[in-house]
Regions:
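Helix-loop-beta hinge of the Bergerat
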Residues: 2-30
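Phosphate/oxyanion-binding active-site loops and adjacent basic polyanion-contact surfaces
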Residues: 11-18, 38, 168, 172
Length: 201
């Protein structure tokens, strides 16, 4: 089953619409109260992540499921040049991107990378954990996986790499990391999509 695709932004109105969408799915699939709350929590976290990651960006939200396997989708077309990104950052209180820590920071950087025309030149070893290129050497398409990121962090912690323990601690604090089975963020052209996977029941 696939729900209607609804427009979303970081607004409270859109959050409530997304939560209603989750409740409709829960009712249709006859989920328990606990399962309904889990679906609502993931929806709310995803919407808050969008607001935190992308600010005023507008996108689309929908839910798909096959039986008890649920996918929450959030997609947006992003066209933000490096110059515009710098302008946005200069408008922040500190004038710098303070977000590149923890799961939220990594996801925010992923959205920035997808929005940045200079994505091919961007490189950060901690951010690249969990990345997979999708296409040839000149392709800007990529996908990030939370599971691959967790696995890479585990290895980094075992090897006592700089920053690995802090990144692991931040991941452990993430509601999504505990509630979701998997989170994937992908870029195809200028379209960024985040999918949260969760099996209920």
């Amino acid at each position: 089953m696939k729900t209607d695709i609804i427009p979303v932004s970081g607004s409270e109105v859109h959050l409530q619409e997304a939560l209603r969408q989750a409740e409709k799915v829960a009712a249709f699939e006859e989920l328990s109260t606990r399962e309904t709350l889990q679906l609502r929590l993931l929806t709310e976290e995803m919407m808050q992540m969008m607001h935190s990651i992308a600010g005023p960006m507008e996108g689309e939200f929908w839910i798909e499921n096959k039986g008890r396997e649920f996918e929450l989708h959030l997609a947006a077309d992003i066209r933000l040049t490096s110059g515009k990104r710098a302008k946005l950052l200069s408008a922040s209180t500190s004038g710098k991107n303070e977000a590149a820590r923890g799961l939220m920071g990594h996801l925010r950087d992923l959205f920035d990378r997808g929005a940045d025309e200079d994505v091919a030149r961007f490189s950060s070893s901690m951010l690249d954990h969990g990345f997979a290129e999708m296409g040839g050497a000149t392709s800007m398409d990529w996908e990030w996986s939370m599971i691959q990121y967790q696995n890479a962090l585990t290895t980094s912690v075992e090897n006592d790499e700089e920053g690995a323990r802090e990144a692991w601690d931040e991941l452990e604090k993430s509601v999504v990391a505990h509630a979701a089975d998997e989170v994937k963020v992908s870029l195809k052209g200028s379209r960024v999509e985040m999918v949260i996977y969760k099996r209920l029941g």
